[in-house]
Amino acid sequence: MAAPSDPPTAATPPAPPPPARRCLLAPSVEPLLFLATLALGLQVPLATQYLWDRLGAERGYVGPNASSPHGCGNGSGAVDPLREEVEALVAHWNLCINLGGFFVGLFSVTLFGPWSDSVGRRPVLVLPAVGMAVQAAVYLLVMYLRLHVAYLLLGRIISGLLGDYNLILAGCFASVADSSNQRTRTFRVAILEACLGVAGMVASVGGGQWRKAEGYINPFWLVLAASLAAALYAALCLQETVKQRRAAKLLTLQHYKAVYKLYTAPEDLSSRRKLALYSLAFFLLVTVHFGTKDLYVLYELGSPLCWASDLIGYGSAASYLAYLSSLGGLRLLQLCLEDTWVAEIGLISNIAGLVVISLATTTPLMFTGYGIMFLSMAATPVIRAKLSKLVGETEQGALFASVACVEGLCSLVATGVFNSLYPSTLHFMRGFPFLFGAILLLIPAAIMGWIEIQDSNLQYSHFSDASSSPADG
């Protein structure tokens, strides 16, 4: 009898909520990561070249710079002391800027990452994108107003306080872990890593040419625009992936304790041991990636390769293509192999390619090394996915915050170790750092193989016990 009193139009009021949606589509974090990586990929080399030109001009140095199109420009002529002074100053400021950003970011990433497990991923993706935009704006002010280069450090610290690029990495990978299941997670992570490669390729190929044509100002406006676009996408279009959000204090030591407990909590000793071993494997693998990538251009510029800028560009594009070929190879190999063995094949590809590059004396042999490394990026998404599967749903933010900090540490260690090793070994083998990297990669290969064999033996023993127990009964 109450039914007639309900008007037929009573179902229409719930309609207003859809227009309240902030965006027509809220698909995934891939566009956000692409934009942020594009901004970073443009900014880092441009900032280094700007420091070179600015500091060189202040000291009256007018010789060739790091972006000159000459191959073997450092032939057998006398060493220019003024050039050495400029190189030392650029290295000094680069080190200060990178260290300042790393140490500030170390505390902010491990604060915001666990916080996102409670309040959601969107806030911790908006903040670092805004920080990167502020950093780009500060860099533009330095260029327009010819401010002291120390202001570049200020921009980097501001970005670090808001989490910097490492927090974007942590938030994106945690978001993928939230929205994927155990079976599909590895491939979803690989898609994210492919975005890193595509964005890096676009920045590498386009940024240098644009700088040569129009200077520094216009490319840095694109850095600012890409960072702002990433922030707007995260704020307005990105779908929240944390299912059960709750209010949580930001400024508390509990967030740092959450990261610490990942590796020390005694509930599941086996999982925590695997977490530490996989983290070590990830550290070594990414350190080799960063360290060798830093040396490719130096190696190609020197004798006997003597590459000009066009060949260097092709080589850079070939190294980034490994992200895409690894994605396709991972997908195909997953049809017949466990993820660990796919990663082992990727490590073998990486090791073989580095050995060939270490011995390369001709252009075809150098490109052969790049070609052999077509599966070299298959191991990192597997390790990230393995780490993600070892922790609970409410620990993904804390986990990927710690992984992002490890990645930042890898960059510093790689720069220190490989850039020191290269000049020290020139007198007996120019390619020794690549051979050293190949040897280091044997350690993560051994770690992953050992864990997989141990797990297989454990599963086999459980299966044997289960099959023999009915007979005993």
UniProtKB/Swiss-Prot annotation:
H(+) binds at residues 164, 193, 289. One of its GO terms (biological process) is folate import across plasma membrane. It comes from the Eukaryota. Residues 1-21 are annotated as: Disordered. PANTHER family: PROTON-COUPLED FOLATE TRANSPORTER, ZGC:174356. Belongs to the major facilitator superfamily. SLC46A family. Proton-coupled folate symporter that mediates folate absorption using an H(+) gradient as a driving force. Involved in the intestinal absorption of folates at the brush-border membrane of the proximal jejunum, and the transport from blood to cerebrospinal fluid across the choroid plexus. Functions at acidic pH via alternate outward- and inward-open conformation states. Protonation of residues in the outward open state primes the protein for transport. This is Proton-coupled folate transporter. It comes from Gallus gallus (Chicken).
